[in-house]
């Protein structure tokens, strides 16, 4: 467990926390509420939730071509305009919580839009940030992109929480898109419901409790993570090859599609359909093949996987040594 990060100095009587909010399916909002509830219930904390609203809203359930049409801009971090924020940038927050969904192995476009907004640079400069991810199971390269966006704002990333769908990878390749396109988590009978499970959402309150306690001791002013020992981020390096292949695919095809036309333009559709064929082929061949090869080579790759896991678990880690302190 990381050492306490308390700095001896006069405390402000109330800690101000900024929480960004954009949840297309509603599940990320549930996770955020679970985390934020202990902070809202504390008399020592004042929580401001800033709901992000794209000028052109993203539907849920997503229509098929609208879903595909989001990937070129997602892959290239080309964000849409947002409705005006309620913040001016002159506000002073002690901690910023940035929850986000993973869209096409990148942060969701509304969150990207906020982080590229001039107001975000004013708000986040020098501020400690906790990121919270809710996704299928591939988030490592999206978090790398998030780190770049936060660095551009001058923010200090203290912690990362990643909550994922517990179902097998090949199962979620079907259940997650069907959820997004149908609006039903259990669209296919006999398969597990898509998304983060209810128990994990409820248990996420431990992060809010730990943040509350850390804020009480001014630990956010230092550089050490606040959520160690709480199994905040348990990465799976065996998925990294698939993430890299898909990220490169999204980027290259996204570049082509952006050259063909802008978001929503009909002339993109033939190329989007062509990409679907390519993507399905990729999913049915490269993904299972890479998982099989890595399983066979796991004894030879143990050291490499251990190093990758340590890298992507950071800064909060996957240890469980403090879990008993915050069990509900």
Outline where the language-model segments fall.
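A polyampholytic, Gly/Pro-enriched intrinsically disordered region
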Residues: 71-73, 149-156, 176-188
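Short aromatic-enriched loop/helix-cap "lid" or pocket-rim segments at secondary-structure transitions
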Residues: 59-64, 143-144, 169-175
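Internal, well-ordered alpha/beta segment that forms a basic, Gly-enriched binding/recognition surface
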Residues: 84, 102, 137, 141
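Short, glycine-/small-residue-rich phosphate/pyrophosphate-handling segment
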Residues: 128-170
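Glycine-rich, phosphate-binding/catalytic loops in enzymes
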Residues: 112-116, 146-149
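N-terminal beta1-alpha1-beta2 submodule of the flavodoxin-like/Rossmannoid cofactor-binding fold
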Residues: 2-99, 105-110, 116, 211-328
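Short, conserved loop/helix-junction motifs that constitute active-site signature segments
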Residues: 120-126
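Glycine-rich phosphate/pyrophosphate-binding loop and the adjoining helix
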Residues: 168-246
